[in-house]
Amino acid sequence: MGKIPIKRILAIDYGKKRTGLAKTDPFCSFAQPVGTFPPEKIITIIKSFLQENSVEKIIVGYPLNSDGTKNPMTGIIDGFIEELSAAFPDIPVEPIDEHGSSKQAGKVLIESGLSRKKRQRKGRLDSAAACLLLQHYLENTGNA
């Protein structure tokens, strides 16, 4: 029997100070944190990730106001999506609404019992937000 190709989905919660990454398990059933990285190094980090993992899609948190209108960060994300598409032309990049994901990630970390210091260390909030974006995506596409 042949080997089943394993493809993952990579989620990005892009920020001006830190960028969180999350990936699916090999069967695209649930999200796992990858880590938090400086935004100026994120393309290099993703290239390295792609050398070790087969990725079928990249999703990017897309910041909209609660009424669905764009905000100042939306333009930055549009530029980042263009940069991703140019760097990785064979992988589709899909923006998904991230409204409230960081706030929800903060609540999850608080409920997990982590101290404020540990929640803030190494940008756990950013990778948790990327995980929540990805899990929400999986649930809405019927993968979870």
From Swiss-Prot:
HAMAP family in UniProt: Nuclease_YqgF
Enzyme class name: hydrolase
A Pfam family this protein belongs to? Answer: RuvX
Looking up Gene3D superfamilies in the UniProt record yields: YqgF/RNase H-like domain
What keywords does the record list, in alphabetical order?
Cytoplasm, Hydrolase, Nuclease, Ribosome biogenesis
Q: Record's InterPro entries?
A: RNaseH-like_sf (IPR012337), YqgF (IPR005227), YqgF/RNaseH-like_dom (IPR006641), YqgF/RNaseH-like_dom_sf (IPR037027)
Q: Give the record's GO biological process terms.
A: rRNA 5'-end processing
Record's function text = Could be a nuclease involved in processing of the 5'-end of pre-16S rRNA.
Q: Which organism is it from?
A: Chlorobium phaeobacteroides (strain BS1)
- On the tree of life, the source organism's domain of life is Bacteria
Instruction: Give the family from UniProt.
Output: Belongs to the YqgF nuclease family.
- GO MF annotation terms: nuclease activity
Q: What EC number(s) is this enzyme filed under?
A: 3.1.-.-
- The entry's protein name is Putative pre-16S rRNA nuclease
Q: Which GO terms describe its cellular component?
A: cytosol
What does the UniProt entry say about where the protein is found?
Cytoplasm
Q: Does the keyword Cytoplasm apply?
A: yes
